[in-house]
Every structure is written in C-alpha cells, then in structure tokens.
Amino acid sequence: MTQAVMLQGTASDVGKSVLAAGLCRIFYQDGLRTAPFKSQNMALNSGITSDGKEMGRAQIFQAEAAGITPDVRMNPVLLKPTSDRQAQVVLMGKVATNMDAVSYHDYKPRLREQILAVYNSLAQEYDVIVLEGAGSPAEINLRDRDIVNMGMAEMAQCPVILVADIDRGGVFAAIYGTLALLHKQERDRVKGVIINKFRGDVALLYSGIEQIESLTGVPVLGVMPWLDVDLEDEDGVALQNDKYRGNAPRDITIAIVQLPHISNFTDFNALAAQPDVRIRYIRRPEALTDADLVILPGSKNTLSDLAWLRESGMADAVLQTHRQGVPVMGICGGYQMLGDTIVDEVESGLGTQPGLGLLNTITRFAQDKITTQVNATMSGELPSWLAAAAGLPVRGYEIHMGETVLQEGCCTAMTLQKNGCSVADGAVTADGLAFGTYLHGLFDSDAFTRAVVNGLRARKGLAPWETTFCYAEHKARQFDLLAEAMRQHIDIDKIYTIMQQHQEPV
C-alpha cells in the first residue's frame, strides 16, 4: 500500500518545498519509488513537461530530487497571478480561464473530485507520495473550501508534519497558534513539527522545544539549520533573501530587473551557480551602475511591468546603460519589452503600446498559450559577447501567448526544432548589444552559458575560463547535501514510523 506524508507550514516561504525535495531524495536513496504532489500551486515560476504541460517549478525540482521525470499530475492546479486580484487558472497543464479570488474560491469545490482522482492515479504507481501544502493550514477564512492543506490531507488520508521558520522570529507562537486554529480532527493529523532555518547553538532551543511539545502534544522531529545549499526557490518573496542581492565579489556582474510580475526567475539559477558570476536582482536605477549584462526576465503581465519600468525610472536607466555599451538581454516577456511595438488586444485591452525600442520587433499577443520543450541551435554567426555561442546546441522551454516578428536591423538568434520543423526564434542586433529570446531555461545549457560568460569576460579584458561548469551535476550534489543534512538533523526513522502507522483506507 502506498505510504504518504504531507508537509504544511506555519506561513509561506518557511521551506516546505525544499524539505519536501529533501524527503523525496531520501526516499529515492532508500530505494523507494517516490513522487511529489501539490494539489494547488500559486506561482509565477513554472516549467513544461515533456508532453507540453505546464506545472509549478517546485514540483519539477522535487521530481528531479526523486529521480523521476516531472509529470503534470504532481501539480494538477496552477494559479499564475496576473494582477493583485486576478490569476490565470491552469488545470492539468493547460490554461482553463482567468478568475478573481472570489470566483475561484467558489469554484474550488468542483476541483476536489479531479484532484483526488489524479492523486490516486499517482499513488497506484509509487511507493511513497510526498505532499506539500500551501501557505498555512490555519487560514480559517479559507477552510471550508480548502483543497491544498488539511482539505488535501483529508482527501489523501495522510499524516501531516508542520514546518515552522525560526529565522523570521516567533517560531513557538507560530507553531502554537497554527495548531490552536485547527479543528481537532485536523490537529490529530499533525504528527510532528520541524523547526527550519535555525542559526546558532541548538541547545538554546531545548527548553522551548520541551514546552511547545508539552503545550501541544506534538513532537518536534528536528531542527534544521540554515543550509548553504543551492536549490530553487519558488516564491517571489525569496528574492528578498541575501543570496539574490549579489553581495559577493565576482569577475562578472549580471543585473536582473526584478519586475513586479517577474516569472521564471529560476531561469538564472544555472547562471548564478557559475563560479565567476554575481547575480543581482535590482529594482532601483542606481543599482545598474556596475552591470556587465542587464537582463529583463519573464513577466506574467508584460504591459503592466513595462509601465512600471517607465514609472520607476528603470527604463531610462536600462537605455542609458545600453548607450554606454552594456548589452541588454530579454527573455520571454522581457524580450517583448525590448522591441519597438507590443500589440495587446487579448490580455489588457491596451491596444498598441511602444516598447523600449532596443530591438526592431513587433509583438502581437494571442489567445493560445504556447507550452513546449524544445531543442535549438544558436545561429551560426553571432556578434560581440555572443560570438563564442554561435552554432551551439541549447535546450529550453516556451511559455508565452504571443508572436514576435523581426523587422529590418535584427537577425534571428537561434533555430528551434518543433514538430519536425525548424522555427526561427529570438532577435539580436548587429552590434550584439540587444538580444532577446522566448526560450526559458537557456542557461541550463552548460556550453552556451560558459560561452556567453567568457564573452563578457573578454569585453573586460579577462581571460576565459576553460572549464565548463555542469549544472546538472551541481543540482544532484545539492540534493544529496540536503538529504544528508536532513538525515543528520531530523528523525527520519520517526517519519517512516509516522507513515507506516498512519494507514487509512482510501
């Protein structure tokens, strides 16, 4: 019979996704067929499965930790916010509709049967399912229609482990308050607590742990230290963390504009892992002063973020930096913004809007979303810092609702292989100072990344690095380091016991 365990949190960004990945890795190391599952994910970081389905990046990297191919069943509902009040609803990997929060809350009960069927189909194929909740189960205003926290635990009939973040302060209040707000039958599902992101001497916590166990009757299964491991973050709130501020000195500094609706910032994890690269996410014009490359990333609301660029002064700063000879790159929504014109008669109804004008392109938004994994080849001749990447193979994925047409003065950046056909993608200027593409995940291609970083090094008079960094091996090492740390600091045997003892008939 399939065993399962669910991680829920006292709040968002407490580390549920990373710890779930760690459990997936541990069970994989122990020889168990393991799959992650999150019934509903709200995130702008998404990826594409091999069959063209869109799902949350967190479940993709958890599947990688488990040594399996990502499957859209691991995240049947994906919500992608388009504004403060609206979100695009993606069901089983395909866009269903756009809804506001109230409409979606009313709609959720209709999803329960489909979510349960998807979960049960996974459970038939795997020995262990590691479930992840969202935010906190103590959102009492959402309890009656919950499908992602205790509502999902009830559907899966699985035990729950509560994750609490001590780094933000008030960890014992968060644990006690969360459990106090649960109904008795919900509290009974909580079989343990993990205190996460601790810095210092754990002995200082012992008296508090004893008291919280006495007050709640729930054992603390371990205290995880703040780990120096390089793993993907899912929530945009994580961009406030130190690792995204680029404080460590490196030869090359790459500035990524932190758009209000930034999506797929995981595009830059492989770039940030390069030993000679410093990544900085910026929101202020003055932060562009030392950049060797500026990147406009993906966006879930291109025209809104383009307006923010202008209102914040970032657009002028990017253009000034470009005039000073610093290359500017755009990915997906960022690529669209670099162009001359954007025509939107689909999403915002704003009609024709001017872009930044660094690429002579016209983008027209469309109703249908393109979601596909692709192989591509960089163009045979590329200028300036891109020259060494000419002709290199790359892999990535597309997630966009629009088509960009090149005008005079732009050259195709790469050729995609799609459905047996060659399709042009991207644009680059003759001087190489403006470059755009729809291809997410481009920097996961090791040879390409090293080629362009060496191109940036050459512009500064620095010698190239001859060694190519393997990002896939790096990720595998990080998963193993995470699993090792969890085995050291968490009672994994107790988690096995919890799963074995909590067997409810489905």
Curated annotation (Swiss-Prot):
PROSITE patterns noted in UniProt: GATASE_COBBQ (PS51274)
Regions crossing the membrane: none
InterPro entries for this protein: Class_I_gatase-like, CobQ/CobB/MinD/ParA_Nub-bd_dom, CobQ_GATase1, CobQ_N, CobQ_synth, GATase_3, P-loop_NTPase
Residues at the catalytic site: C332, H440
Superkingdom of the organism of origin: Bacteria
Pfam families cross-referenced by the UniProt entry: CbiA, GATase_3
Example of a GO MF term: ABC-type vitamin B12 transporter activity
Pathway: Cofactor biosynthesis; adenosylcobalamin biosynthesis
Domain named GATase cobBQ-type: residues: 251-448
SUPFAM superfamilies, alphabetized: Class I glutamine amidotransferase-like, P-loop containing nucleoside triphosphate hydrolases
Keywords, alphabetical: Cobalamin biosynthesis, Glutamine amidotransferase
PANTHER family assigned: COBYRIC ACID SYNTHASE (PTHR21343:SF1), DETHIOBIOTIN SYNTHETASE (PTHR21343)
Role this protein plays: Catalyzes amidations at positions B, D, E, and G on adenosylcobyrinic A,C-diamide. NH(2) groups are provided by glutamine, and one molecule of ATP is hydrogenolyzed for each amidation.
HAMAP family in the cross-refs: CobQ (MF_00028)
Entry's family note: Belongs to the CobB/CobQ family. CobQ subfamily.
Name listed for the protein in its UniProt record: Cobyric acid synthase
Gene this chain is encoded by: cobQ
